[in-house]
Regions:
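Acidic beta-strand-to-loop metal/phosphate-binding motif
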Residues: 69, 109-121, 143-144
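Generic structural signal for residues in well-ordered beta-strands
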Residues: 87, 140-142
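Short, acidic/turn-prone active-site loops that include or flank metal/cofactor-
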Residues: 91-96, 117-118, 146
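Switch/connector loops and helix/strand junctions flanking conserved nucleotide-binding motifs
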Residues: 122-125, 150-153
C-alpha cells in the first residue's frame, strides 16, 4: 500500500533531498526533506508536519555496544560514509527524550557517545542528553569536537582521528 505522501505533489519539497524515516518496525512514519542550498528556509521539512521523529536509523540491532549520537541526518551520513557505521541521528537537539534512549537500551546498546555540534547550543544539549542517557542506564560521554565544528563537515582524516579518540583505550 502506498504511503499518502506519494499521492500528491508538494512544491515545498522541490530542491530537497528527501529521506524516508522508518520506525523500529520498518514502517515509514515520515519524510525528512533537506534543502540543498544554505539560503532556503526552512532548511528541513518534515512530512507529515506533526510526525514524531524516531532516532534514525531506529533499528540498531546490528550495532554492538555503543552508538554515536549526532544531531542531523547529514552528520550521520558523513560518519557512516567514512566508516563509523554506528552513528545515529536524533533530528535536532530538541527531539531527544528518555523514551527514545530507552529503545536503544532495549536493543542491547549499552553506551552513547554524544557528538553534537561544537557550538554552545550543541554542547549544552549534549550535557542534557548525557543526563537523560544515564537515567535510562546508558553509559554516556560528551565528545566535544571543538568550537563550531560540525560532524557533518568532518573530512576523512578528522573522522579517522575521531574513531581513534572513541575506540582506542
Amino acid at each position: 500500500k502506498r504511503f499518502e505522501a506519494f499521492l500528491h505533489h508538494d512544491r515545498s519539497f522541490n530542491g530537497r533531498i528527501v529521506f524516508p524515516i522508518r520506525d523500529i518496525t520498518g514502517k515509514v512514519v515520515a519524510f525528512n526533506g533537506r534543502h540543498m542550498t544554505m539560503t532556503e528556509r526552512p532548511k528541513y521539512l518534515i512530512y507529515p508536519p506533526q510526525a514524531v521523529m524516531p532516532l534514525f536509523p531506529s533499528n540498531v540491532k546490528s550495532v554492538k555496544g555503543k552508538i554515536i549520537l549526532v544531531e542531523g541526518i547529514f552528520d550521520m551520513i558523513n560518519l557512516h560514509d567514512k566508516g563509523l557505521t554506528n552513528a545515529v541521528c536524533c533530528f535536532g537537539t530538541s527531539n531527544i527524550d528518555a523514551d527514545k534512549l530507552a529503545i536503544l537500551k532495549m536493543q542491547n546498546i549499552d553506551g552513547v557517545d554524544i557528538v553534537f555540534d561544537g557550538d554552545e547550543a550543541g554542547q549544552s544539549a549534549a550535557e542534557n542528553v548525557k543526563v537523560l542517557a544515564e537515567k535510562v542506564g546508558l553509559v554516556s560521554r560528551n565528545v566535544n569536537l571543538g568550537a563550531n565544528i560540525d560532524p557533518g563537515a568532518l573530512a576523512e582524516v578528522k573522522v579517522h582521528s575521531l574513531r581513534e579518540r572513541l575506540y582506542s583505550s
